[in-house]
């Protein structure tokens, strides 16, 4: 997905999914470490969670998110998105992933998917399982689209993530992080040229750019783990829409919450000194 689905998890977690892990850190703490670019410590938090809750898919899928975020940081993926217009995105080069990180990323996703499907056979309305599968498909879409430049595969995973998100919202309407998957899908496809939108709709993916922004706003305001990521994606969208005040407000809030991440200070400076149109020099 163009803006990263990612990522990549809501207020609807079951009690098991938000328990404190053995070292006193929760999944919330793990995500805070990710947004502050402390990938090694986040990995340890997610491993601890898996040891405490071996049947819960959330630990593994969160670990996969950490691997993806680390690659985004190493390759400058999010930084590039702030000043890439749709034409330059289409012409982007395929990046060179770290083979070891890629293998660990997919291994974590396979583990999460296996645990999630196992839980769904026992309870089709298992919220953690549906959440993990929503996130897993979104992470695959991000990796395929933003790192490997496999656009068709990315759209396939985007559709998959949206389907899981809709199932999750049917179980619990207050799983606000699930709106990240559907919002990104709506925004990206709604931003495409009309003939491409038509072809994508034939494949069963709907598109409404403004609805996508509204769903991202919902996650940004009321989401849990993914609320900060939704704010990042919204800031990117606002830059592309040339809405500098909103983009700057979001980036300031992110800078203040995650001071160890230089991206936010850097992008505020670019907003203040560079024109909104075109790519960064």
Give residue spans per PLM region.
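Bacterial N-terminal signal peptides
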Residues: 2-12
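Sec/Tat signal peptide C-region and signal peptidase I cleavage site
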Residues: 13-17
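Short coil/linker segments at helix-helix boundaries
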Residues: 18-26, 33-46, 55, 66-125, ...
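Amphipathic alpha-helical segments of tetratricopeptide repeats
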Residues: 51, 220-221, 255-256
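Flexible, substrate/cofactor-facing loop regions flanked by secondary structure
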Residues: 225
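A cross-kingdom marker for long, charged
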Residues: 229, 236-281
């Amino acid at each position: 997905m163009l803006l990263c689905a990612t990522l990549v998890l809501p207020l609807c977690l079951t009690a098991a999914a938000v328990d404190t892990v053995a070292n006193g850190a929760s999944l919330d703490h793990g995500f805070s470490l990710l947004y502050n670019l402390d990938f090694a410590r986040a990995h340890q938090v997610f491993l601890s969670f898996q040891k405490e809750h071996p049947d819960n898919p959330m630990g593994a899928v969160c670990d996969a998110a950490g691997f993806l975020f680390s690659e985004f940081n190493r390759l400058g993926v999010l930084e590039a998105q702030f000043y890439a217009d749709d034409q330059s995105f289409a012409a982007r080069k395929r990046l060179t992933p770290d083979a070891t990180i890629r293998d660990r990323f997919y291994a974590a996703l396979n583990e999460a998917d296996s645990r999630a499907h196992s839980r769904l056979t026992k309870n089709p309305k298992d919220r953690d399982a549906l959440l993990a599968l929503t996130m897993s498909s979104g992470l695959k879409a991000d990796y395929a689209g933003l790192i490997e430049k496999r656009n068709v595969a990315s759209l396939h995973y985007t559709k998959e993530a949206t389907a899981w998100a809709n199932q999750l919202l049917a179980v619990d309407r207050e799983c606000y992080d699930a709106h990240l998957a559907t919002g990104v899908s709506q925004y990206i496809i709604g931003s495409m040229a009309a003939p491409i939108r038509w072809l994508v709709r034939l494949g069963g993916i709907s598109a409404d750019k403004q609805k996508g922004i509204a769903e991202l706003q919902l996650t940004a305001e009321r989401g849990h783990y993914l609320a900060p990521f939704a704010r990042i994606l919204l800031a990117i969208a606002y830059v592309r829409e040339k809405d500098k005040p909103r983009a700057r407000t979001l980036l300031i809030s992110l800078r203040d919450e995650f001071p160890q991440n230089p991206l936010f200070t850097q992008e505020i400076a670019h907003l203040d000194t560079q024109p909104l149109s075109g790519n960064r020099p």
